[in-house]
């Protein structure tokens, strides 16, 4: 283990307010869920300190901006149109047909993914991962469930993996009705189209770490495909450091006609599930006030920092919940497997266009029809996903063994971590915020060391440690537990 240390008494605190900096991004801001939520600096300034500087979000570099610009609303529209053309993509609709049902959709998705991979010079591969699901909840007879996975293998750290999925199965009102048309244009051809579009873009840009882009099945019947994928990765000891679930990301208009075209919600669970964290660690997390600093919430903060900007044209509204109220999604299986995972969903769902038989009643059109999809909005959500995934993959790995010394009773904070021996790590940053702030508000670069003493009380702020790459990309922060 390599430890180096630094002790700080004070440092320059910049007078600029994060609100003032971010307000120059010239975005429409129907909802603010980042530093722009603060009406003035005073809200972010307690406890007062002359340590560090106010945190400025990581800007996309020229390469990432160019990649984000490649995400095409026209391509996404064409993909959703094709997926809708299969009539139904119900998990049980395993018809012997090349034009209708989930198998036909699966084969087309795989064919398109392979076309993209052919442009990658061998850095992207495509796999159709299948298994037979026996009779279970919402599965009245054995059925083959298939996930289509495009893997962009990392050039420098291929064993560090990030996953993004959308589900390509669909449904109508009766979850067991696999005969009727179930277009599923928004739920979730929109997320599937984003996964496919990102595969197209990433085939031409090899990331430093591995990115898996998946179209998964069985979601509407009980998250079967994604859970199988998560367990397969866990069983092979795959180091998944983040998972993004795109589900119902195709409409900017709510059921009351309200429009919010520049915001995407990011749902992030608090304390990890009992399958992912020991009871002792869970009890300690609650004792020290770490319930808002789970790996999932650090991932959501990271996405808000790197993907809410004028390159994507979007804001990321973090929601402190596993999912919508009493609902679930394909990130759940990853969380249960111990992986950080979040869900993106449009800001205002229209339930007349979700899980509905196609019909018109009293002048209201029901059904998940393509006419209700906003392709420009969906493309912007794709840009958020791309900016998040690329920033994760290009950054160094998260710091390991991050601890805070609780043996000394004073108003300094002593934080320790293992210094990486990787040459892509330039330094480490301590980030912090008040206990009521959603996002990190302050930062201090302490160099390539493994120990720091700060004149800030651990009683008053929340700390995190993140790695800074030689390329300028920064990892998600890691919350320190008592040593």
UniProtKB/Swiss-Prot annotation:
Cofactor entry: Zn(2+)
Chain sites annotated for binding Zn(2+) 2: 187, 220
Domain of life according to the entry: Eukaryota
One Pfam family this sequence matches: Peptidase_M28
Keywords for this protein: Glycoprotein, Hydrolase, Metal-binding, Metalloprotease, Protease, Secreted, Signal, Zinc
InterPro entries: M28_fam, Peptidase_M28
Cell compartment(s), UniProt: Secreted
Region forming the signal peptide: 1-18
Residues noted as binding Zn(2+) 1 in the record, renumbered to the chain: 167, 187, 247
Top EC class, one word: hydrolase
Main localization category: secreted
Single GO cellular component term: extracellular region
GO biological process: proteolysis
Glycan attachment positions: 96, 121, 235, 310, 362, 401, 411, 421
Domain Fibronectin type-III: from-to ranges: 396-483
Record EC number: 3.4.-.-
GO molecular function, one term: metalloexopeptidase activity
Cofactor comment text: Binds 2 Zn(2+) ions per subunit.
Assigned protein family: Belongs to the peptidase M28 family. M28B subfamily.
Name under which the protein is recorded: Probable zinc metalloprotease PTT_08196
